[in-house]
């Protein structure tokens, strides 16, 4: 299987997001990279499912709460930006203050 660098990055982000989801399910508080990976993976999968940019920007704010992450992590993540492929082209999805 040959993947372009962009495809490799998307695959790595997906794997990191799945690992973060498993750790969250075990009751572990997520660190910064895990939190960003989980939110980013959620956005990418939502785009694949056909959701709009506006829907993803809104829904991604409910993926994690301050209780799900280690102390201070929520304050460290001011924005999450993910470039996703939608039916009408590639778009940048930006979620401001995703952990509340």
UniProtKB/Swiss-Prot annotation:
Pathway: Nitrogen metabolism; urea degradation; CO(2) and NH(3) from urea (urease route): step 1/1
Molecular-function GO terms, alphabetical: nickel cation binding; urease activity
Broad EC category: hydrolase
Known catalytic reactions: urea + 2 H2O + H(+) = hydrogencarbonate + 2 NH4(+)
Keyword Signal: no
EC number(s) from the headed UniProt entry: 3.5.1.5
Gene Ontology process terms (BP): urea catabolic process
Principal localisation: cytoplasm
Key word Membrane present: no
Assembly description: Heterotrimer of UreA (gamma), UreB (beta) and UreC (alpha) subunits. Three heterotrimers associate to form the active enzyme.
Protein name per its UniProtKB record: Urease subunit gamma
Gene: ureA
């Amino acid at each position: 299987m040959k993947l372009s660098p962009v495809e490799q990055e998307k695959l790595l982000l997906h794997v990191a997001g799945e690992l973060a989801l498993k750790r969250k399910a075990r009751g572990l508080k997520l660190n910064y990279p895990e939190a960003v990976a989980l939110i980013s993976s959620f956005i990418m999968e939502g785009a694949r499912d056909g959701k709009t940019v506006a829907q993803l920007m809104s829904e991604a704010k409910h993926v994690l709460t301050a209780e799900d992450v280690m102390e201070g992590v929520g304050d460290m993540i001011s924005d999450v930006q993910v470039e996703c492929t939608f039916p009408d082209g590639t778009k940048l999805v930006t979620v401001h203050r995703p952990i509340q």
